[in-house]
């Protein structure tokens, strides 16, 4: 994880997560992220609907991983599109300045993306001054699954927190590859700010 500062009050995080089995034979690799909030959206990066559908994946029923059996209200789509997730903390009872976490992720062939709900975040439920009753709210969850290896097709993400009063400074996130085949582990990211800075 890297922090990129673009101004006195603006910046974002970059995460490039690679995963593979040392001896090959990779079935799949998962990228798991959850965030506070009462609502979450997951769309293509251009804002179009991904048409997520209910799924039984991410559970013991899928014979993949016991730890995912606590997830519920799971939805999934197979897509190679770049995606954007937005987690929202509704602050209507605290002055109306909603808080967002914006996540952009590069698409890849043989990838699936999921939304799900997880049990509430116990540790934070005891923190005073939280903007909503965390004990009554499940934890919003995003999962990306890469079939095969995820070393040359890593999970490439950009995260930016924002609020209603201090909106996102990012206009778009795009990705590029290099033509040099020896650099097959290269991850190129182009973040365009609303002020024109790239």
Pin down the residues of each PLM region.
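CBM-like, beta-strand-rich accessory domains located in the C-terminal region of large
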Residues: 1-198
């Amino acid at each position: 994880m890297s922090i990129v500062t673009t101004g006195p009050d603006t910046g974002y995080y970059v995460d490039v997560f690679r995963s593979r089995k040392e001896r090959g034979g990779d079935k799949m690799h998962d990228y798991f992220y959850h965030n506070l909030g009462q609502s979450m959206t997951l769309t293509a990066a251009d804002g179009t609907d991904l048409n997520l559908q209910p799924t039984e994946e991410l559970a013991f029923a899928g014979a993949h991983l016991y730890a995912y059996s606590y997830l519920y209200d799971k939805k999934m789509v197979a897509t190679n599109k770049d995606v954007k997730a937005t987690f929202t903390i509704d602050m209507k009872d605290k002055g109306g300045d909603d808080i967002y976490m914006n996540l952009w992720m590069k698409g890849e062939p043989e990838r699936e993306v999921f939304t799900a709900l997880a049990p509430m975040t116990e540790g934070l439920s005891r923190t005073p001054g939280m903007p909503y009753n965390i004990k009554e709210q499940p934890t919003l969850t995003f999962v990306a699954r890469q079939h095969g290896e995820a070393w040359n097709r890593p999970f490439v993400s950009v995260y930016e927190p924002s609020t209603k009063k201090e909106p996102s400074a990012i206009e778009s996130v795009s990705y590029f590859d290099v033509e040099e085949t020896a650099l097959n582990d290269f991850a190129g990211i182009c973040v365009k700010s609303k002020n024109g800075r790239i």
